[in-house]
């Protein structure tokens, strides 16, 4: 584990940025979307220490980059530290992330834990590694957040991840749930935030290409074919090509839930409807008014 690298001048994130108009248009869009997510869900507050989980993939690089740029212009003061979990995967290029962090004056930690061997051992033959791997990764990162005094743990999930999770739970889990933009961990010790919640994956792909991030592929799970999530993602990509507004509408639905129009008895008290109906009929004047309205409508026809 490496101690965080600090510039002698304090916060000094000044990367060499692309100069194209396409980059600045996209940057403006991403800043706006991330800013709205942070505001809508009160993700970052004055004095926060935000631990950004960096895997070396396009999503976490983009998240870290946008948050660091926000820190330069934000009206509040908050700290950012990048954390990578080195899971000891064979062939993992251990020098890539430290070099990127140091070249850009980004405080970082490398947390070394051999979760790769444990995942391989605990996963039954023929099953994917995702469940075991993610559980071990979460436990390691959440515990480390407590060690360094992080008040928020930032994850790189984007809008399309949230939608894909919704359909995974719908098709395979029998539940209506996705990934919330902000969440209290199950042990109630960490606040998890997803600042990219409003950002589309295709914009992240484009941004990562323009910024030329040193992407590290995931050889552990990326080599496994026919993952349920991969199939869902392919479905979403096809929808996006054929019906460009469909994913936007689906994500909007996740923010516009009507419990009374579903069938979850824990979410909505259906029994109270009977008492409400009886209360209405106890008022003879109210009942007379309703009948008058009905009679008028029939007369009009």
Swiss-Prot record:
NCBIfam families in alphabetical order: PRK10696.1
Any one GO BP annotation for this protein: tRNA thio-modification
Protein EC: 2.8.1.-
Subunit annotation: Homodimer.
Subcellular location: Cytoplasm
Name used for this protein in its record: tRNA-cytidine(32) 2-sulfurtransferase
Catalytic activity: cytidine(32) in tRNA + S-sulfanyl-L-cysteinyl-[cysteine desulfurase] + AH2 + ATP = 2-thiocytidine(32) in tRNA + L-cysteinyl-[cysteine desulfurase] + A + AMP + diphosphate + H(+)
Miscellaneous comment as given in the Swiss-Prot or TrEMBL entry: The thiolation reaction likely consists of two steps: a first activation step by ATP to form an adenylated intermediate of the target base of tRNA, and a second nucleophilic substitution step of the sulfur (S) atom supplied by the hydrosulfide attached to the Fe-S cluster.
Positions of [4Fe-4S] cluster binding: 130, 133, 221
Function statement: Catalyzes the ATP-dependent 2-thiolation of cytidine in position 32 of tRNA, to form 2-thiocytidine (s(2)C32). The sulfur atoms are provided by the cysteine/cysteine desulfurase (IscS) system.
UniProt family annotation: Belongs to the TtcA family.
GO molecular function, one term: magnesium ion binding
HAMAP family linked: TtcA
Matching Gene3D superfamilies: HUPs
